[in-house]
């Protein structure tokens, strides 16, 4: 079970039988019954609930865990009781996407607070990710200022807001921008030199699951040639 666009299509297509991918709305809309009917869940890190660790069971895939790089291990270290129950599958930086404007492109994350963009910015729906963006802008009282800049909090429909003209800037993971950038040369995605929050694609095993993680399938996405294909789509394998 995974929301649309969270799992790269070439990787999803490589799922071996009898595994089958079911696409669903965003994680906050998943019912307990839906979670109980599936053996694996894929979601973005913005929707993790550290208070719900009992809903998941340990990943129990030490050969995969040993390969994780420092950034992935740092993520797990922040997850408390969820640490052993989450497997980072892929990572992509958050970027700012807007119609090509050289002046805007040079400002970095501070562009999000530009008064000229008040009410014209689309931010991620996850409060956790909005707080991470605020940290990149200096933290403190910046969070309230950032929220006031928002037209809406809707990364699922962010590109629609931008293309219709209601928004001037949207914040999205790079992997969500690649296809659009190829189709529309008027758009630009900017990854500020100061760095960016990371969007993690995570694998979890519901408490009722009796199926182990399909390790060979995970390894396939972490190794060439599929790994190269995923990089072209804006995803990076979280391994050393």
Residue spans for each PLM region:
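Alpha-to-beta junction loops
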Residues: 18, 34-43, 117-119, 163-172
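A bilobed periplasmic-binding-protein/Venus flytrap-type ligand-binding module shared by bacterial periplasmic
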Residues: 95-102, 198-214, 229-230
């Amino acid at each position: 079970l995974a929301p649309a666009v969270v799992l790269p299509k070439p990787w999803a297509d490589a799922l071996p039988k009898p595994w089958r991918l079911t696409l669903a709305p965003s994680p906050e809309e998943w019912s307990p019954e839906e979670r109980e009917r599936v053996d694996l869940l894929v979601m973005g890190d913005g929707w993790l609930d550290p208070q719900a660790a009992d809903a998941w069971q340990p990943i129990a895939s030490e050969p995969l865990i040993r390969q994780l790089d420092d950034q992935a291990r740092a993520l797990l270290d922040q997850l408390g009781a969820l640490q052993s129950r989450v497997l980072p599958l892929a990572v992509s930086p958050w970027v700012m996407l807007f119609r090509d404007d050289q002046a805007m492109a040079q400002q970095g994350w501070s562009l999000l607070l530009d008064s000229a963009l008040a009410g014209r910015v689309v931010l991620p729906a996850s409060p956790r990710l909005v707080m991470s963006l605020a940290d990149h802008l200096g933290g403190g009282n910046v969070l309230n200022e950032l929220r006031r800049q928002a037209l809406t909090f809707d990364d699922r429909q962010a590109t629609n807001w931008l293309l219709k003209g209601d928004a001037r800037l949207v914040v999205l993971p790079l992997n969500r921008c690649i296809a659009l950038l190829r189709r529309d040369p008027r758009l630009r995605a900017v990854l500020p030199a100061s760095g960016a929050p990371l969007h993690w694609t995570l694998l979890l095993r519901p408490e009722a699951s009796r199926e182990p993680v399909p390790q060979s399938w995970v390894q396939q996405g972490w190794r060439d040639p599929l790994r190269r294909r995923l990089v072209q789509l804006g995803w990076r394998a979280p391994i050393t």
